[in-house]
C-alpha cells in the first residue's frame, strides 16, 4: 500500500 500524506 502506497499512500502519500504531506505534512503541510
Swiss-Prot record:
InterPro entries from the UniProt entry: Adipokinetic_hormone_CS
Gene Ontology cellular-component terms listed: extracellular region
GO biological process: flight behavior; neuropeptide signaling pathway
Broad class of where this protein is predominantly found: secreted
Modified residues (Tryptophan amide): 8
Molecular function per GO: hormone activity
Assigned keywords, A-Z: Amidation, Flight, Hormone, Neuropeptide, Pyrrolidone carboxylic acid, Secreted
Keyword Transport: no
Cell location: Secreted
Modified residues (Pyrrolidone carboxylic acid): 1
Family: Belongs to the AKH/HRTH/RPCH family.
Function in brief: This hormone, released from cells in the corpora cardiaca, causes release of diglycerides from the fat body and stimulation of muscles to use these diglycerides as an energy source during energy-demanding processes.
Protein's name in the database: Adipokinetic hormone
